[in-house]
Regions:
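Extended, charge-enriched "interface" segments that sit outside catalytic cores
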Residues: 2-114
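Glycine-rich oxoanion-binding loops at beta->alpha junctions
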Residues: 91-112, 135-171
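Conserved beta-strand elements of the Class I
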Residues: 119-123, 171, 201, 293
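Conserved phosphate/anionic-ligand binding catalytic regions in large, soluble enzymes, centered on
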Residues: 120-134, 231-239, 305
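A glycine- and small-aliphatic-rich helix-loop capping segment at beta-alpha/alpha-beta transitions
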Residues: 130-145, 164-166, 189-195, 214-220
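Extended, hydrophobic alpha-helical segments in both membrane/secreted and soluble proteins
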Residues: 131, 158, 174-192, 200-202, ...
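Active-site phosphate/pyrophosphate-binding segments
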Residues: 187, 194-326
């Protein structure tokens, strides 16, 4: 594919032209249930020939071998020479560093849960907020009665969300990978005036920066700097789930991610991950449909569309390819 075709960086002798895939009556009927989730692509009328060619394309370009390499920790971010480490947090037996980070976070979550507080005020933006928000609404009972989430730097937001609170009876969580995100730091300082650092916890990969800022050492919850922000819900960033629902539910969430990884690694072209990719490429590259609609009918999943939007657009909207070319 060329860069004009949505930046698909794969080589192939196959001729992916729309005229080759006009027989939509002879389409695949992919319906599969995995771990309680139903996947039904039958109504998309993806031609069998396109599906066959897409499988060949994946095999020619060793897509599954490349994913296995990323999963195993090979360098995927060539620009910064970094691995993609969010997989480690959800593995059954992660490397010691990631296991220690999860265990430390769970220890802190247990300590916080036993404190007497009225509200948790959570400061974060982008992936540091969208993931925890989705998990909170989906998995935590009465989430918004227990948590105030602040994600911008508009004083109107601070006033509306915190003016009625007794800040001395609040726990403050600052979620920022770099701990230098302007919106997050400015909003935290606007609300607290830096007066409640003993009841403030920083979830960050910048431990030195947190110490310099004044966060007590015991209140700094680290996670790996190679974990991308949009994938950070698998890291200690999701401490809210552990605080309010406990270790068992948090580990159950990680286990679900692990099962999805294993399904792709083991079932390959039969996995929902592969088939949803086939669906997207067919709609985007062949039919030239540039809009994806996500309807979340379940109230608890009302923030899924926002999370999925950032996840896909930030992942696929890069202007630099893997060879560092614009």
């Amino acid at each position: 594919y060329s860069k004009e075709n949505y930046g698909i960086l794969m080589n192939s002798e196959l001729n992916f032209e729309k005229n080759n895939y006009m027989d939509r009556e002879n389409s695949i009927e992919y319906v599969r249930k995995i771990h309680g989730i139903n996947f039904d692509l039958s109504n998309h009328k993806i031609p069998k020939k396109f599906h066959e060619d897409f499988e060949k394309l994946a095999q020619e370009n060793r897509i599954f071998e490349k994913f296995q390499g990323i999963y195993n920790g090979e360098k995927a971010n060539r620009t910064e020479n970094k691995s993609v480490t969010h997989f480690e947090y959800r593995k059954k037996d992660p490397h010691k560093k990631f296991k220690d980070e999860i265990n430390f976070m769970l220890q802190k979550a247990d300590q916080i849960s036993k404190k007497s507080f009225d509200k948790i005020i959570f400061f974060g933006i982008g992936g540091s907020q969208l993931g925890p928000l989705l998990l909170g609404e989906a998995l935590i009972s009465n989430f918004h009665e227990k948590v105030v989430m602040i994600t911008g730097s508009d004083p109107e937001e601070f006033s509306e969300k915190t003016s009625y609170l007794n800040l001395e009876k609040c726990i403050f969580l600052v979620a920022s990978k770099s701990l230098s995100t302007m919106e997050t730091i400015n909003s935290f300082e606007a609300v607290t005036n830096k007066n409640f650092l003993k009841s403030t916890y920083a979830i960050t990969s910048n431990v030195d920066g947190a110490l310099e800022y004044g966060i007590p050492q015991e209140n700094i919850i680290p996670f790996d700097r190679s974990t991308g922000g949009r994938f950070s819900c698998w890291s200690p960033i999701s401490i809210l789930l552990a605080i309010l629902e406990g270790e068992k539910k948090y580990r159950s969430f990680l286990e679900g991610g692990m099962k999805a990884d294993h399904d792709l690694l083991e079932n390959k072209t039969l996995s929902p991950s592969f088939m949803l990719s086939c669906q997207d490429i067919y709609n985007n590259n062949i039919l030239k449909n540039q809009t994806t609609l996500i309807l979340n009918y379940d109230w608890k999943l009302r923030s899924f569309s926002k999370y999925a939007q950032q996840l896909e657009m930030e992942s696929n909207g890069k202007s630099i390819d893997q060879n560092n070319q614009a």
